[in-house]
Amino acid sequence: MKAVPLDLKEANDYVSRLHRHHAPVYRDKFRIGCQDDEGNLCGVAQVGRPVNRIMDDGKTLEVVRLCTDGTPNACSFLYSRCARVAKELGYSRIVTYILESEDGASLKASGWKQDKTSVGGGSWNCPSRPRDVIDRQISMFGETKKYPTEKKKRFCKEL
């Protein structure tokens, strides 16, 4: 596997096609692509400022999107690269959120730890910030909810 640079449009196109439950992001700090041994793009990760305002302390970044085509070890590879780049940029911590139904094996394999702090979940749709709620989307993993409303787990890595 090899890390490759991507521009925002390339990363968002990939996320738009393959992410199971999120739309592309509007902006990020950096993004990394993952190529398999044949040179095919098999995953992307996008890293930005933390969505949680309390965590946005200037020393923390968040993996806001990570999406692969199912290539083995691509997720772990991308999480590791994101942490490495964030450290080189001078950040002291990197975080990400996964659904409660996901086990976090790729994060654990990359040295990330689950935060003991309880985090929320549910719908982000509210009168002051309405979301386009799409009940279902078809993906390579079958039909899934576009915006899952289950609880989230936060994983962190101290850099």
Segment roles from a protein language model:
Residues 1-25:
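Short amphipathic alpha-helix that is part of the acyltransferase structural core
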Residues 4-5, 29, 36, 48-138:
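Acyl-donor binding region in acyl/amide transferases
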Residues 15, 28-45:
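Conserved beta-hairpin
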Residues 20-24, 113-117, 142-146:
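Short secondary-structure junctions
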Residues 30-32, 59, 151-155:
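Short beta-strand micro-motifs in enzyme catalytic cores
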Residues 124-159:
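C-terminal "cap" of GNAT-fold acetyltransferases
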